[in-house]
Amino acid sequence: MKNPLVASLCAIVAALGACSPVETATELASPAKIDRAEVSLDGESDTYKITWVTSEAGSAVDLSVSSSPDGSNATPIAEDIKESSFTWKPAAGENGRRYFVVTPDAGEPTVTATRLLPLEGGRNFRDLGGYKTEDGRTVKWGQVFRSGTMHELTDSDYEYLSGVGIKVVCDFRAAQERATEPTTWRAGAADYISFPDPATDPGGNFMRVLFEPNVTPEMVADAMAKGYPAIAKEQAPAYSEMFDRLAAGEIPLAFNCSAGKDRAGTGAALLLTALGVPRETVVADYALSETYVDYMAEFTGSADDPISADSPYAYLAKMPPELLAPLMRSDPRYIETTFQTLEAEYGSVMNFIETELGVTEAELQSIRSSLLE
């Protein structure tokens, strides 16, 4: 009598042998994945360039575009693309934020979008979506935005932002900043929140070094790095409120300061850390600010656009540019110093978030549930 197990194995081997090698390999191959996808926008031509990297070189993808951050109800724009990029121009008169869906053959779709919002009067207004976390999830697009001052947003900008649906705006600026450059939010109903001035101003410490005798650019950069951790502590009440609103599901939410790189950058770094985004990605997001904004031109003017005498930043234009340069940077060293200080004093950045910002484990779970996919 034949052993039934041996007979079964023989049948399986025979069946496999009946298949061609190509068919077997096709059946066993894993579907391609999108390892990375990015979008850039040429504002002059209103042309988007979508680029991607697949897990299998040469894998074909389909592209579609949606007005929803989750990519739902997307409209196909191209199929079976074997290249790694595609350019697309919307029809004339079609405005609003766009999210692109990249779908590999038999694989899972990936949503991507421009990180910097194309606003006429925006300063560093950008989406925190698309970042991968250490546990394999992704920060959802269109839910949290970071920005600089919003006082120059145009009617067209507000029309664009109306489609984003922001429900809460947390303004980290001091009272004098808000009075000088007021935000007049008009992109739909939103809860605009401002905060009492901190007991001390970390920015004052950065500026004082400029007036020291024999000051050098290196001294200014060192002072910037040394004083940077104070931002997290002085802005703790504001950051705590931001986390509370996120935990309550009040999204989409935007937060801003003046430049959009220091107080907003620290807030973004704390939030991304709480979501489980790797440190190197958090630092890279922080460093993007100087890529998107020419801060020297913004705060001191240029030959084509000189700063007005009544500007609150007019005094900066009178200072040596080489000394101002470190203050205008989003140098990775600055936020890394913050992380190192918080780790030395609290054991970890997460301990700071939990103890000083008062974010509970239940709130963290709620925030992650809302903002990750």
Where are the model-predicted features located?
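C-terminal motif of bacterial Sec signal peptides marking the signal peptidase cleavage site
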Residues: 15-18
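Ser/Thr-glycine-rich phosphate-binding loops at phosphate-binding pockets of nucleotides
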Residues: 259, 263-264
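Compact beta-sheet-dominated domain cores in extracellular/mature segments
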Residues: 9-13
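Residues at the beta-strand->loop junction immediately N-terminal to the Walker
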Residues: 256
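Bacterial N-terminal signal peptides that target proteins for export
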Residues: 1-8
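Cys-dependent protein tyrosine phosphatase-like superfamily
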Residues: 20-253, 267-373
